[in-house]
């Protein structure tokens, strides 16, 4: 689209008359966002003067229609048609797809403080007037000269001494004339028509000064006159648009004063022509009713004109009151409305409708109808009424100073105090098409432009460098503002994108905790214009007509009693009809007195004599909400998954219902302080062994407390589910007793799976558990003797990663206990990422995944027989492993007796186990119990069968289901092999089988399972484990778990699910991980490479790594780490990359605990950030812990952290604030720092940050003082000459004074140093 910009000197009119059209009203906006279809509007012509029309000012009677241009030059009908066609063509041109770029056309910076802005109402010049604390400037802007804003004249300079007129007007001004200083609450306004060269400002807090912009202060004093009758600060003043000589002002003294420039300019009188007392209620803003004459420009305008606009004005007060006056009856308030709950700050009239917009400190912008109440309004056309319209006055009601109980027609919640607001000066048939510009005195550096059609989404957001101070519409498209950075900005809103252009039109999002679980929105973006076919209720003849609030005269015999009146108001608010007894029928209703001379139509309708109806013919909150016919609201689909799932689950698990309202959790969640203290005590910040041993008793104590209070209600009950969740299994289980029985069977199965493990450690003996842990450490240290350095390094890294995995599980459970879902997900994600690292180090190949899944039942058995198991298989596609959050935690916490020294020696008899493993499959059960052999180190995704005759595998497709049933002596199923599928069986050449096979040995017949199960999500991990423990398991128990898991590997190795794909299934991976940590992989008597079964021809490259010695594996891992340094080869789940992103997110969101946890646990391993940042963060965190009286946590953190001298980080440091010696502002330079950082990330050039420093100022774009000798910026060490104050580089001044022996300053100071 072309960036065509209309010149601002086009023909526009300065309207003078007020067209009195009957209001198009509306009630309060509904709570839903309504979107309107596109509609074609007739182009609204601007309200500013047109250049082609010469100035012609008329000062006739008040009832005459004043015009701002020469009617003799009024364009003919042909010319008007051409103008309309050009305007429509221009609108079509602008309606084409526009690039989403800013519509900022003008921007200039001034050296003076600015606080207010207004336009010069002169059609011959594009001029603005800006005022501030010590500045009053006359500016001009031009669209032809690169869109520049130029300062033409400044009026704050000293005047000539010969100004007798000034002294005669106000002798006190003679003392101030040499130093004009405008007040900090300065306002500036420009006159109209004859007085369009006059501007009014506040010279100080109580004096209003009138300047003539056509006078040069070098020749004549531009000060025309001044008014100083206010006793306190003047907050606002305004010129009358029709009676242009009238000026109104309001101040803190609660006085409204009206001045006539004609009577005060020459007579020297300083008295106001009219004074209105507002009962000591400070006035924040006061405005005349505007008098635009839109009928002169829009031939389709059919409203009636009136001459009353020059008499009416409105004011907003500190108490929040909105008052409307008529100067013909100054002692009477026409309207009195409680507009805001706090102080009202500003107001603005609608250009052609009887509405006022007010803004207050309560953060609300309210639209009020302040026109006369309409009783019966037959509709002739949209926006007009018949001459028989009744105007009912409320004079007597407001004479009693009673406040109107009406609510606003619309409320826009901005969220910040509204200090400036102005309607766009354009004629609108439908008031809902009006645009309203709003700015704030807060920290919001923007100007919001709202369309009344969509009060929830602004149409335009005009961004500024700092908060806005003032704004003004030049015409219907161009708007100017001033901000705190002393900038003047101008936007063309036709070139500015709307907010809807950048919003998504369809959205689907999850809610993790309470409320609607899933929200889906699909809608059309809509427009910011109302439907032209929409007729407001005030003009709808199909609606029943009545009064607004029934405001009768106080002396009227038909008045309503106080009690019944309040009852009627309450019932009207609920849109219900009040009974006929609410009104006493004591006589006919009187005809109220009117301000106008129009005839009165009687109110004798029997409807008002029988009942009180909520008004439907006037814009009031008592009406029904606006009914936008033909507009389809957005479709919002809300699925409350947490509520559904909790009801389904708790209905089957009734004993767990009370846990959802646990008193312990409720006590923790009472305040954020208690939550922080709980997390600081429970989270693990270090994996030091000393601390773990010391805290083991506290962990056991915590476990007992948790067991006594019942199982934990997991957070996963409150989040969604997937297609593989276990909630259906929980629903299908019959009773809680069955669940408890199966849990007991699971423990008994574990206790009987290995008698040697049970005999070594008593589950009730904590002393033996500690001894086992110490023995384990000795064996691990003994296993490192004679190992290569690479193997020792890999073993050390595996030890650390395993410890970190357990810590992550513990921290995740801590957050799940308090229903903190986001942090629970983060720690689960970190744990899964660490398991990836473990997989890469150990070279464990992940298990086979297929579309189908099969349940493999082993030592963790819930069921008593196979038939019951297969019956439940139809209702769930998950295995029993999904009932435990992680093999690391569940086996340890529920079976602490499973650890023995025998578990550490399972690999010593590897050869014997290999020979024994070649027995027939029918003897496998006895073989496991009698010999206690270990699993053969065959990759989990390949299972082979050899025969003694060198032949191929025999067909196992005829194996029946009965052959797969294996019974133990204790009636516990240890192995369940499903139907065999031999199509994927691997056939090995006889030459690769007969090697190292003793003659006469029997063949091994173990079927191949080709079906795996689907990935288990983290949701399944915790949904199916409400008994998830919070304590972290001991390392000794972790190793014991792997020993038992190795038995399961021998029974069905192909059924293992990759630990990387699910954190709940890691037995096979951890088996090899622990073996590597024990230092046994390098010293085995038979490695995979020496296996009698050669699989090299059938293995993938990654699988072949399992048959290599440990040294080759480590070399391969090293080469992989080198490649990983390149970001394009790094997977998105790479741990170092993930942790850095999580750390940055924690810093940005203020998650202190997560940031410190990542630093203390992962800094040494993954180098998350710099050491300076680490020490500074730990120091600040220690201070926070001291603030919350967590001294023991702070001491433990300092004791076990990897860095020294944490507390000395700020011992000798001091904070020095540097201020710019040019503009006086604090040097922060965040803007340039951000730019240089982006350049560094984009280019990778480290020299980019060398440009950054604090030797320059971003605010004024100037460097600080230059070196007195070399005249270059001082970026590093600086020295200052105390005698004269000149500064210079240390090197320069050292050479000057020491090497060259000078004793004077390089600047040439005479004083000898």
From Swiss-Prot:
The parts of the chain that form a coiled coil are none
Would I find Transmembrane among this entry's keywords?
A: no
Q: Output the SMART domains linked to this UniProt entry.
A: WD40 (SM00320)
Superkingdom in the source lineage: Eukaryota
Q: Where is this region: Disordered?
A: 1-22, 38-83
Any GO BP: positive regulation of macroautophagy
* Record-level Gene Ontology MF annotations: zinc ion binding
Q: Biased-composition ranges for Polar residues?
A: 1-17
* RING-type Zn finger ranges: 1267-1309
Gene3D superfamilies registered for this protein in UniProt: YVTN repeat-like/Quinoprotein amine dehydrogenase
Where in or outside the cell it occurs: the entry states: Vacuole
Q: Name one GO cellular component term.
A: vacuolar membrane
- The biased composition feature labelled Low complexity covers 57-69
**Keyword presence, Metal-binding:** yes
The alphabetical list of record keywords is: Metal-binding, Repeat, Vacuole, WD repeat, Zinc, Zinc-finger
Compositional bias annotation for Basic and acidic residues: 70-83
Which InterPro entries does this UniProt record tie to the protein? WD40/YVTN_repeat-like_dom_sf, WD40_repeat_CS, WD40_repeat_dom_sf, WD40_rpt, WDR24, WDR59_RTC1-like_RING_Znf, Znf_RING
- Start-end of each WD repeat: 180-221, 229-269, 339-378, 442-484, 711-752, 795-837, 1100-1143, 1190-1229
What this chain does, per the entry, is described as: May be involved in a process influencing telomere capping.
Q: What family does this belong to? A: Belongs to the WD repeat RTC1 family.
Q: What is this protein called?
A: Restriction of telomere capping protein 1
- According to its UniProt entry, this protein's organism is Vanderwaltozyma polyspora (strain ATCC 22028 / DSM 70294 / BCRC 21397 / CBS 2163 / NBRC 10782 / NRRL Y-8283 / UCD 57-17)
The organism's taxonomy opens as: Eukaryota, Fungi, Dikarya, Ascomycota, Saccharomycotina
């Amino acid at each position: 689209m072309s960036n065509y910009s209309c010149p601002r000197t086009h023909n526009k009119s300065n309207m003078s008359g007020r067209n009195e059209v009957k209001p198009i009203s509306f009630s309060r906006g509904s709570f839903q966002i309504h979107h309107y279809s596109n509609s074609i509007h007739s182009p609204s012509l601007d309200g500013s003067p047109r250049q082609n029309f010469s100035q012609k000012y008329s000062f006739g009677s008040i009832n005459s229609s004043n015009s701002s241009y020469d009617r003799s030059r009024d364009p003919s009908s042909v010319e008007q048609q051409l103008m309309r066609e050009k305007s429509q063509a221009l609108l079509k041109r602008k309606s084409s797809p526009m690039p989403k770029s800013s519509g900022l056309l003008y921007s200039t910076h001034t050296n003076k403080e600015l606080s207010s802005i207004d336009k010069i109402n002169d059609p011959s010049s594009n001029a603005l007037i800006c005022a501030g604390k010590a500045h009053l400037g006359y500016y001009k802007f031009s669209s032809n000269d690169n869109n520049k804003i130029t300062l033409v004249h400044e009026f704050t300079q000293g005047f000539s001494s010969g100004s007798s007129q000034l002294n005669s007007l106000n002798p006190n001004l003679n003392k101030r004339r040499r130093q004009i200083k405008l007040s900090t609450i300065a306002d500036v306004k420009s006159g109209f028509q004859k007085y369009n060269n006059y501007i009014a400002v506040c010279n100080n807090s109580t004096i209003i000064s009138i300047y003539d912009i056509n006078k040069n202060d070098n020749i004549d004093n531009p000060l025309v006159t001044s008014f100083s009758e206010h006793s306190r600060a003047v907050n606002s003043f305004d010129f009358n648009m029709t009676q242009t000589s009238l000026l109104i002002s309001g101040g803190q003294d609660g006085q409204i004063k009206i001045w006539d420039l004609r009577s005060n300019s020459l007579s020297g009188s300083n008295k106001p022509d009219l004074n209105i007392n507002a009962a000591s209620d400070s006035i924040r803003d006061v405005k005349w009713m505007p008098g635009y004459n839109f009928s002169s420009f829009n031939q389709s305008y059919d409203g009636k004109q009136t001459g009353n606009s020059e008499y009416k004005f409105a004011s907003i007060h500190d108490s929040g009151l909105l008052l409307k006056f008529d100067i013909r009856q100054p002692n009477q308030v026409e309207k009195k409305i409680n507009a805001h709950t706090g102080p009202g700050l500003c107001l603005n009239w609608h250009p052609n409708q009887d509405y006022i917009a007010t803004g207050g400190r309560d953060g609300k912008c309210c639209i009020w109808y302040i026109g006369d109440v309409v009783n019966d309004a037959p509709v002739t056309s949209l926006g007009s009424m018949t001459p028989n319209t009744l105007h009912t006055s409320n004079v007597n009601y407001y004479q009693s100073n009673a406040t109107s109980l009406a609510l606003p027609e619309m409320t826009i919640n901005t969220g910040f105090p509204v200090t400036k607001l102005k309607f766009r000066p354009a004629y609108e048939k439908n008031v809902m098409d009006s645009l309203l510009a709003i700015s704030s005195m807060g920290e919001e550096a923007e100007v919001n432009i709202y369309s009344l059609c969509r009060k929830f989404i602004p149409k335009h957001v005009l961004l500024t460098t700092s908060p806005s101070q003032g704004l003004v519409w030049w015409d219907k498209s161009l708007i100017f503002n001033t901000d705190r950075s002393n900038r003047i900005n101008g936007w063309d809103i036709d070139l500015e994108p709307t907010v809807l252009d950048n919003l998504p039109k369809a959205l689907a999002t999850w809610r993790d905790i309470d409320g609607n679980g899933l929200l889906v929105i699909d809608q059309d973006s809509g427009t910011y214009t109302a439907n032209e076919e929409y007729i407001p209720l005030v003009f709808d003849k199909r609606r029943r007509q009545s009064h607004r609030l029934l405001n009768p005269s106080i002396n009227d015999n038909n008045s309503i009693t106080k009690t019944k009146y309040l009852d009627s108001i309450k019932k009207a608010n609920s849109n219900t009809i009040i009974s006929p007894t609410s009104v006493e029928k004591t006589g006919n209703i009187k005809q109220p007195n009117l301000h106008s001379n129009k005839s009165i139509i009687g109110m004798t309708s029997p409807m008002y004599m029988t009942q009180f109806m909520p008004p439907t013919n006037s814009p009031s909150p008592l009406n029904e909400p606006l009914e936008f016919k033909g507009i389809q609201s957005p479709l919002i689909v809300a699925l409350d998954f947490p509520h559904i799932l909790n009801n389904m689950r708790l209905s089957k698990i009734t004993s767990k219902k009370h846990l959802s309202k646990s008193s312990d959790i409720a006590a923790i969640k009472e305040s954020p302080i208690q939550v922080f203290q709980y997390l600081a005590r429970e989270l693990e910040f270090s994996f030091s062994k000393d601390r773990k041993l010391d805290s083991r008793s506290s962990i056991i104590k915590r476990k007992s407390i948790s067991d006594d209070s019942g199982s934990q209600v997991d957070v996963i009950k409150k989040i969604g589910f997937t297609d593989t969740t276990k909630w259906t299994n929980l629903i299908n289980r019959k009773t809680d007793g069955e669940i408890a029985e199966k849990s007991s069977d699971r423990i008994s199965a574990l206790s009987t799976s290995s008698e040697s493990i049970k005999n070594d450690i008593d589950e009730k003996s904590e002393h033996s558990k500690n001894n086992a842990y110490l023995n384990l450490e000795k064996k691990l240290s003994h296993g490192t003797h004679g190992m290569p350095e690479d193997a020792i390094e890999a073993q050390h890294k595996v030890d650390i990663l395993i410890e970190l995995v357990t810590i992550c599980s513990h921290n995740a459970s801590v957050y799940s206990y308090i229903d903190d879902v986001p942090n629970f997900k983060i720690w689960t994600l970190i744990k899964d990422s660490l398991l990836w690292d473990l997989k890469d180090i150990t070279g464990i190949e992940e298990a086979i995944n297929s579309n189908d899944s099969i349940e493999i039942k082993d030592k963790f058995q819930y069921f008593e027989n196979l038939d019951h198991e297969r019956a439940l298989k139809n209702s769930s596609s998950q295995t029993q492993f999904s009932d435990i959050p992680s093999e690391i935690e569940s086996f340890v916490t529920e079976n602490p007796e499973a650890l023995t020294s025998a578990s550490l020696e399972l690999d010593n008899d590897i050869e014997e186990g290999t020979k024994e493993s070649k027995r027939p499959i029918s003897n496998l059960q006895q073989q496991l119990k009698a010999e206690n052999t270990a699993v053969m180190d065959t990759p989990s995704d390949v299972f082979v069968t050899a025969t003694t005759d060198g032949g191929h595998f025999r067909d196992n497709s005829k194996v029946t289901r009965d052959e797969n049933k294996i019974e133990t002596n204790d009636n516990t199923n240890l192995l369940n092999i499903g139907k065999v599928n031999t199509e994927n069986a691997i056939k090995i050449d006889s030459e690769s089988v007969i090697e190292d096979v003793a003659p006469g040995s029997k063949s091994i017949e173990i079927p191949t399972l080709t079906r795996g199960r689907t990935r288990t999500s983290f949701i399944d991990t915790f949904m199916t484990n409400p008994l998830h423990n919070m304590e972290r398991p001991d390392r000794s128990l972790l190793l014991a778990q792997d020993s038992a898991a190795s038995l399961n590997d021998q029974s069905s190795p192909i059924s293992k699910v990759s630990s990387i794909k699910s954190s709940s299934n890691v037995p096979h991976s951890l088996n090899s991980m622990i073996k590597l940590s024990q230092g046994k992989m390098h010293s085995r008597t038979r490695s995979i490479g020496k296996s009698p079964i050669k699989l090299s021809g059938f293995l993938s490259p990654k699988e072949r790594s399992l048959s290599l010695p440990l040294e080759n594996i480590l070399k391969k891992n090293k080469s992989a780490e080198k490649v990983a340094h390149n970001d394009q080869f790094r997977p998105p789940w790479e741990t170092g990359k993930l942790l850095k992103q999580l750390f940055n997110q924690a810093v940005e969101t203020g998650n202190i605990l997560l940031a410190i946890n990542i630093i203390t646990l992962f800094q040494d391993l993954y180098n998350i950030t710099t050491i300076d940042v680490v020490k500074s963060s730990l120091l600040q965190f220690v201070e926070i812990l001291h603030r919350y009286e967590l001294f023991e946590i702070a001491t433990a953190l300092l004791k076990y952290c990897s860095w020294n001298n944490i507390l000395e980080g700020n011992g000798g440091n001091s904070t020095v604030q540097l201020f710019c010696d040019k503009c006086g502002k604090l040097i922060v330079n965040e803007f340039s720092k951000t730019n240089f950082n982006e350049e560094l990330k984009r280019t990778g050039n480290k020299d980019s940050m060398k440009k950054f420093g604090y030797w320059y100022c971003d605010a004024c774009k100037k460097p600080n003082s230059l070196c007195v000798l070399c005249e270059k910026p001082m970026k590093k060490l600086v020295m200052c000459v105390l005698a004269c104050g000149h500064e210079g580089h240390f090197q320069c001044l050292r050479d000057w004074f020491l090497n060259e022996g000078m004793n004077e300053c390089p600047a040439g100071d005479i004083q000898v140093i």
